[in-house]
């Protein structure tokens, strides 16, 4: 669909309908309902959908149809403007005061709009509709509410702009247009801001469309109206007011009563079957209403919207724009005092702004520390510089605070071979001197820590310089429940000693996997596969 500005049409500009080779009925053609004063819309038609109406061609041939001057700048090449067929008013889409069609094959490929032509299209060019929108004059209330609203603004800014624009109505300015109807008044739906829902793991899920029943929860909805009648109608949005199954169960159940009333036959048609109005329980209705019902999407015809509120109703986002939007019809409660909704919205915005301005900074309740170390190593006093890839610490407490769980120290070798003598030496000599030598030994040793992601080659080389190293877990068994400390140390020693064999074995496994994938792919394509090792060819 293309749009263009600066097109003017006189009200009495008409033409005699002579050529009726292709005259489609485009009342059901859906084009987004937006306020486009004096703008042209160009839309592609489909022959199998927008078929030629023979009866309309016979009836309207020779009659006057509204027309306008189609600007040549719409097309990239010369176009036979005399071959456009202007449609009667009753055959135009809703919201257009004039429009015509170029039949199939009338426009050349060079003159047909590129954006509307399908890629790789063959055959004659499809028909094209060129229409002029009505010069829509919205009510003063709608203009004042929508004056400063922009799509790019966040929801909070839109809310404030609506209230700021509505202050003129509070000061006594009333709309000068005549009432649309005496049976009901037209309202604008305003949804109060709700707390954001947690993000869904499936953000692009398919949105279910409800065609059989539509029961939204309108308890958090305000209806703004310029004048008050016993009944009011408002266009709902399937996006902002989605179908709620719990409301449907409550409306069709026997647990609570749904207040009902009769819709005036002078304003509404007779509803039957699935199109009948669904009356809501009072707890799901907006404030200030004693009864209310909802008409599902598609229950009312386009003609009804056109004759009643179609061109004056505020636009609402819909999941399906090819059918008419849902409608709320409510009966105002006269017994309750009148609620100044605009004032309530202003107070809510001021309260929200004051809360945001005085909101203190939230500090984390738990200090989540990031593990820095993995292994603490004692190095000799002769080499105070930490090994490659490690950093120095002052004490074991500092190393354990950094997250070290493995302790490596140089193992002192003894010449005694008798186990009993070794035990006697350990029990008789080592234990009494442990406390005395502890402080002196700590002064002679330097502590270094390795990160969890340190290079394993650097760790192994540092341990190799120590000679015979003793690996231990300083943490007790209660501090590591469910962990076999001895087995973990054996596995760590195996990884440090046989790291090259582990790497070569892993590399061989990857090469074997690549070989099998290539072999299976070639055999699946029925191509001979040559084995690299033996040189033989395999055929499937």
From Swiss-Prot:
Family: Belongs to the DM7 family.
Record field: compositional bias (Basic and acidic residues): 417-443
Annotated region (Disordered), positions in chain: 416-443
Alphabetical UniProt keywords: Repeat
Protein name: DM7 family protein GM11956
InterPro entries named in the record: DM7
Signal peptide as annotated in the record: none
